[in-house]
């Protein structure tokens, strides 16, 4: 069992929150956001490449994404990848540029996305709690090896719990903000 390392535990907890923020940024909210297309992979040149490696994505208007494909021969595969990504977007081809109007979300779809945001947040909370458990186990192991006293362990556990609560609060705030954005409240 590894020694208790608060900095490492904090880094891992913050990593879970950053991962949550990344997941949340990929949820469509009815407004153009370039992160929406980040997970799209395009099959070009005989291999699968992220969209960002074959095109430039921008949001020139609040309800429009623009995908500037660098190589004209890749326009069709990029268009196909966007259509098949399940985002409900229909690219409009304009030479090397694909325009993606962002349609309004239906109330039903908004609720689905809000549930998905909640699920992402719960997964982040679980990851954070798992990190806390690892820290608690390390503290108990250190105490059993007589490397720290019982008082030091309890003090460190209290600190770790406070850190966990703070990080979970950050995750909850990120999810709540995204849900509010999705539901348009």
From Swiss-Prot:
Alphabetized Gene3D superfamilies for the sequence: 3.30.1360.40, Ribosome-recycling factor (1.10.132.20)
Membrane-spanning segments: none
InterPro entries named in the record: Ribosome_recyc_fac, Ribosome_recyc_fac_dom, RRF_sf
Keywords: Cytoplasm, Protein biosynthesis
Highest taxon of source: Bacteria
Localization terms from the record: Cytoplasm
One Gene Ontology term of the molecular function aspect: ribosomal large subunit binding
Keyword Cytoplasm: yes
CC per GO annotation: cytosol
Broad class of the protein's primary localization: cytoplasm
Keyword flag Protein biosynthesis: yes
UniProt family annotation: Belongs to the RRF family.
Protein task: Responsible for the release of ribosomes from messenger RNA at the termination of protein biosynthesis. May increase the efficiency of translation by recycling ribosomes from one round of translation to another.
Protein name listed in UniProt: Ribosome-recycling factor
